[in-house]
């Protein structure tokens, strides 16, 4: 375990391979990751000052490379010392950089986010049971008694390299992050987390979690790190409101409706925000574009051939077809007043979909549903138009007389 507030690095590592070897593996992982992050602090400074897509990607890469280095080092030690052979560790970390954080994860340790009174799990267990549940080959009831419930499919150090999950998250004042080993979450249901958080002071939470796990069996090492994101009252209100607006707006867009909270967070990690002054064109009719826009605050007018057709307010979105191709925009969208929008670029979304295959399948299925709905609507409108035309043609001869 590591809590380094100066570096903004928080780690939980749960060693495997016997008590002594497991301790070596987890300690080696913590130290290697810390040293790599320390040597590359400039990457985090860049993200803090300017959270561009390039700086976000660099920070995610920093975390992934750090964990890969730890994996290679543990594997090397295990293969030079027969008493350590087969050792490894689960690993989860949160690296903070201003209003952004990067989660790195391998194994079955977890990160929970408590935001606005709700608990969200931001990691997915790398276990055989989790894979079977995802594939639908077992039920949750069967998982509870399965002989394979402790089988891990990924760990740091078992092989020379490992697949690392990374996730970039917003750090909003009032948020609470809980990093823990399976020694805790194995005795704790997700829906119990918020009541426990509300029932204890922040300083007492780790002890409260550990006592609960011990009371319920405590068969494994129990580790928990609790992190609270602070800010002044003004910043807290504004940042919380905007973070909530971004997530709520994303949930309402049909393209993202089947995604989990973790997957929606991944989409938000590739989104950017921008404020347009009143009267400024956001997209221009006839010009190519590749971004989806979501109105976070303010109003926009949709115009075609200089005529206003509609108005969108907070939560409205436009330009989604730009995610599919580079066709010219069919209308101009203009800010009616100072307006803040969230933008998702096609290439950034495609890169995310390449990394997250399940997310990609869900989005493609949603896109097919959207196209199907639009096709039905178009067919219905065409049918109505044909009927109206038939009536006009039938009446026309009599009108001429």
Functional labels for PLM-detected ranges:
Residues 1-276, 296, 327, 368-369, ...:
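PP2C/PPM-type serine/threonine phosphatase catalytic domain
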Residues 162-165, 288, 305:
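Short alpha-helix capping/helix-loop boundary micro-motifs
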Residues 260, 272-287, 311-314:
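Conserved short histidine dyad/triad with adjacent acidic residue
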Residues 264, 349-389:
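A small-molecule sensor/coupling module
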Residues 279, 290-305, 314-316:
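Glycine- and acidic-residue-biased ligand/ion/polar-headgroup-sensing regions
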Residues 310-365:
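Cyclic-nucleotide recognition modules
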Residues 385-401:
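Phosphate-/nucleic-acid-contacting segments
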């Amino acid at each position: 375990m590591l809590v380094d507030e100066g570096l903004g690095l928080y780690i939980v590592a749960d060693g495997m391979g016997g008590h002594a070897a497991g301790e070596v593996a987890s300690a080696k992982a913590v130290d290697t990751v810390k040293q790599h992050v320390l040597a590359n602090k400039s990457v985090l400074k860049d993200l803090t000052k300017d959270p561009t897509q390039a700086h976000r990607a660099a920070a995610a890469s920093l975390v992934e490379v750090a964990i890969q280095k730890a994996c290679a080092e543990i594997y090397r030690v295990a293969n030079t010392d027969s008493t350590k052979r087969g050792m490894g560790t689960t690993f989860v970390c949160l690296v903070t950089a201003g209003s952004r954080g990067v989660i790195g994860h391998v194994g079955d340790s977890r990160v929970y986010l408590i935001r606005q009174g709700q608990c969200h799990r931001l990691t997915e267990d790398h276990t055989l049971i989790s894979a079977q549940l995802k594939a639908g080959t077992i039920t949750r009831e069967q998982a509870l008694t399965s002989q394979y419930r402790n089988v891990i499919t990924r760990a740091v150090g078992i092989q020379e390299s490992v697949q690392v999950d990374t996730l970039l998250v917003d750090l909003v004042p009032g948020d609470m992050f809980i990093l823990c080993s399976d020694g805790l979450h194995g005795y704790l249901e997700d829906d119990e987390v918020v009541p426990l958080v509300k029932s204890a002071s922040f300083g007492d939470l780790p002890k409260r979690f550990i006592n609960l796990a011990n009371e319920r069996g405590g068969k494994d090492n129990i580790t928990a790190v609790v992190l609270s994101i602070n800010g002044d009252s003004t910043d807290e209100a504004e940042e919380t409101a905007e973070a909530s607006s971004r997530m709520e707006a994303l949930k309402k867009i049909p393209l993202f409706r089947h995604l989990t909270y973790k997957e929606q967070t991944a989409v938000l990690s590739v989104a950017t925000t921008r404020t347009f002054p009143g009267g400024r064109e956001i997209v221009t009719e006839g010009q190519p574009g590749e971004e989806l826009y979501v109105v976070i605050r303010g109003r926009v007018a949709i115009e075609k051939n200089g005529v206003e057709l509609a108005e969108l307010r907070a939560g409205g979105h436009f330009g989604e077809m730009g995610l599919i191709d580079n066709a010219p925009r069919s209308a101009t969208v203009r800010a009616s007043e100072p307006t803040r929008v969230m933008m998702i670029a096609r290439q950034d979304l495609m890169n995310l979909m390449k990394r997250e295959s399940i997310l990609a399948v869900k989005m493609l299925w949603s896109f097919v549903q959207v196209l199907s709905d639009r096709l039905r609507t178009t067919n219905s409108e065409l049918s109505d138009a044909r009927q109206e035309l038939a009536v006009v043609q039938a009446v026309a001869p009599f009108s001429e007389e």
